[in-house]
Amino acid sequence: MSVLSGILKTFVGDKSKKDLKGLYPLVDKIHQATQVLSELSHDELRAKTLEFKQHIAEIRKPLYDEINEVKSRIEALSDVDEKESLYAEIDRITTQAHDEVAAYLDNILPEAFAVVKETAKRFKDNEQLVVTATPFDRTLSAIKSNVKIKSDKALWANSWDAVGKPVTWDMVHYDVQLVGGIVLHQGKIAEMQT
């Protein structure tokens, strides 16, 4: 069987190599987006995540409104067959919402991954990041020792206690880790051999 596999690889090629070859253009886009994001302030970089979330909410809102309208029509009905057709309509709208959000996530993948990579770089290069405090920062500061609030600023330390052991962030994502993240985003299984 291994002889046959070798012959097939010679003529057809190695599937994993082909798959990887298709992912590296996305990795290049992540690097390009990271360069652009490196010019942003800490607050501007954080705002990118909110921008992503708001756009997802904008995609979902009209569809969820439509689902709620269909649900209210269902409540007014007693005919089981009519209800069944409306439940099928809800399923169709839910699938549409999922598909539209998935398309948006695929579209922003390079920039979203770049936000994470740039954030990791900033934590690696700085002992502390100072940002405008948000309600989330205030909540986290009550339970996490590496987040402090001073006036209207949140101070995020790059080291913290993990089960009694001090840990300092010292990593920026390698290309192979970006590839692994892309593969997982695509719903595939990835085995990291690093």
Where are these regions (language model features)?
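A conserved P-loop NTPase coupling/switch region
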Residues: M1-S16, L20
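Conserved pre-motif I regulatory segment
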Residues: S16-Q193
